[in-house]
């Protein structure tokens, strides 16, 4: 099934009516820019794939860090003591009377 000249003319006419004659050149220009950017990115990725990544070399005299042992004399925090020393917050719910409450 191929498109004849009348079908192509109708499709072009519909595109012009839908998008407007003023927007078509801008749309074509932006599509062209996008295609150029896409092609350049693909070429750059292919170039990156062709050059193998060189392994990083450690500088001379580099030594791996030694493991540090944790000190043994650390005390665990006592959270209960901390909360006991906190001032007591007043309970505002005790004195609150609900105005919508029926007796």
From Swiss-Prot:
It is found in: Cell membrane. The gene is tatA. InterPro entries: TatA/B/E (IPR003369), TatA/E (IPR006312). This is Sec-independent protein translocase protein TatA. Residues 42-103 are annotated as: Disordered. Residues 52-90 have a biased composition (Low complexity). Belongs to the TatA/E family. It is a single-pass membrane protein. The keyword Zinc does not apply. The keyword Protein biosynthesis does not apply. Pfam families: TatA_B_E. The Tat system comprises two distinct complexes: a TatABC complex, containing multiple copies of TatA, TatB and TatC subunits, and a separate TatA complex, containing only TatA subunits. Substrates initially bind to the TatABC complex, which probably triggers association of the separate TatA complex to form the active translocon. One of its GO terms (cellular component) is TAT protein transport complex. One of its GO terms (molecular function) is protein transmembrane transporter activity. One of its GO terms (biological process) is protein transport by the Tat complex. Part of the twin-arginine translocation (Tat) system that transports large folded proteins containing a characteristic twin-arginine motif in their signal peptide across membranes. TatA could form the protein-conducting channel of the Tat system.
């Amino acid at each position: 099934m191929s498109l004849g000249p009348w079908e192509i003319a109708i499709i072009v006419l519909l595109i012009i009516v839908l998008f407007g004659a003023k927007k078509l050149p801008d749309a074509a220009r932006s599509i062209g820019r996008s295609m150029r950017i896409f092609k350049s990115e693909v070429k750059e990725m292919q170039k990156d794939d062709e050059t193998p990544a060189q392994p990083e070399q450690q500088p001379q005299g580099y030594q791996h860090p030694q493991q540090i042992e944790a000190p043994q004399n650390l005390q665990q925090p006592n959270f209960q003591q901390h909360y006991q020393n906190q001032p007591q917050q007043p309970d505002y719910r005790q004195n609150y009377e609900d105005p919508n409450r029926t007796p």
